[in-house]
């Protein structure tokens, strides 16, 4: 139906109407306002302390971190970890968070994870939403701003959680984001860092072990010599190769049973080891 806007010359009220095409789908309002994509200055320190010194040491039996010297202390960084469990987002800050670099991590998460009470918590802990099918311009701009500020961003390149321990097909978004930002602002020096996370159990339970291996950075500037689309595919292929190498090394370590171990014996108190050159304080239980 088509109606027109008209005003009566005798002072009567206006009649305002518009044409509405029933076949046109209007875009929904953003589910999460951009202004809410901020880390809480009070919640983050509390949650980080609880996770690092209480929750993780109490839950896991053995936490091993290798390669912390590969984490830059400054400059834009994109961590590209394997995705094996919901514990990953707690384990990553433990392995490469503020105790190591003095900065917090930003997480790219799905829109569904930003709803309700969980969403309130996620958004204040560095998470921000992305529509994996149709990324909003605001989200892409936010990523570029994070890179300009020299932040540390976490993107799970596999997308979903895979509990079989194998590296699955990587999404191309992480390479495209890195190269687009580096192309738009030459000299940013974006580094993409492969990270392997492996648990001793597919569904980690109390007393399970976790092995985090951090590889050397992939320099985004090394992929700026040709067509960005082709270079993004090359970066994705190189990232896949590195993640597979890390995962295989972690699998070998996981299959080595310690001497005098017994499946029936209860888990020992959390033993934390780091094989990088950076030594971290270990809380006493």
PLM regions and their residue ranges:
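Non-catalytic C-terminal accessory region of glycerolipid acyltransferases
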Residues: 2-31, 137-285
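Conserved beta-strand scaffold positions in the cores of enzyme catalytic domains, especially
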Residues: 65, 107, 127-129, 192, ...
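Alpha-helical membrane-targeting segments
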Residues: 35-62, 115-125, 205, 273, ...
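A conditional alpha-helix N-cap/helix-loop micro-motif detector
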Residues: 61, 133-137
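Structural motif corresponding to alpha-helix initiation and N-cap regions
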Residues: 65, 115, 137-140
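Residues at the C-termini of beta-strands that transition into short coil/loop
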Residues: 69, 111, 131-133, 196, ...
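Catalytic core of membrane glycerolipid acyltransferases/transacylases, capturing the structured
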Residues: 33, 73-134
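Helix-to-loop junction immediately C-terminal to a conserved catalytic motif
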Residues: 51-83
């Amino acid at each position: 139906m088509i109606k027109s806007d008209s005003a009566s010359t005798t002072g009567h009220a206006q009649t305002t109407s518009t044409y509405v095409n029933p076949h046109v789908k209007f875009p929904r309002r953003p589910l999460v306002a951009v202004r809410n994509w901020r880390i809480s200055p009070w919640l983050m320190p509390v949650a980080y302390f609880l996770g690092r010194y209480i929750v993780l040491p109490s839950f896991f039996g053995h936490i091993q971190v290798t390669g912390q010297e590969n984490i830059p202390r400054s400059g834009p960084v994109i961590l590209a970890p394997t995705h094996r469990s919901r514990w990953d987002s707690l384990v990553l800050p433990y392995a490469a968070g503020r105790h190591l670099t003095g900065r917090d991590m930003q997480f790219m998460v799905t829109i569904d994870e930003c709803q309700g009470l969980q969403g309130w918590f996620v958004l204040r802990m560095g998470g921000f939403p992305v529509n994996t099918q149709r990324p909003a311009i605001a989200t892409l701009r936010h990523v570029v701003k994070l890179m300009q500020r020299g932040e540390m961003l976490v993107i799970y390149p596999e997308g979903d959680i895979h509990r079989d321990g194998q590296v699955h097909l990587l999404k191309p978004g992480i390479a495209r984001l890195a190269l687009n930002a580096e192309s738009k602002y030459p000299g940013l020096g974006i580094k993409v860092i492969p990270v392997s996370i492996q648990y001793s159990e597919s569904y980690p339970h109390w007393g399970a072990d976790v092995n985090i291996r951090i590889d050397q950075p992939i320099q985004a500037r090394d992929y700026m010599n040709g067509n960005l689309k082709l270079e993004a595919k090359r970066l994705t292929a190189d990232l896949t190769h590195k993640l597979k190498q890390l995962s295989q090394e972690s699998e070998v370590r996981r299959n080595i049973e310690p001497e005098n171990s017994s499946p029936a014996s209860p888990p020992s108190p959390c033993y934390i080891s780091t094989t990088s050159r950076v030594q971290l304080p270990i809380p006493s239980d």
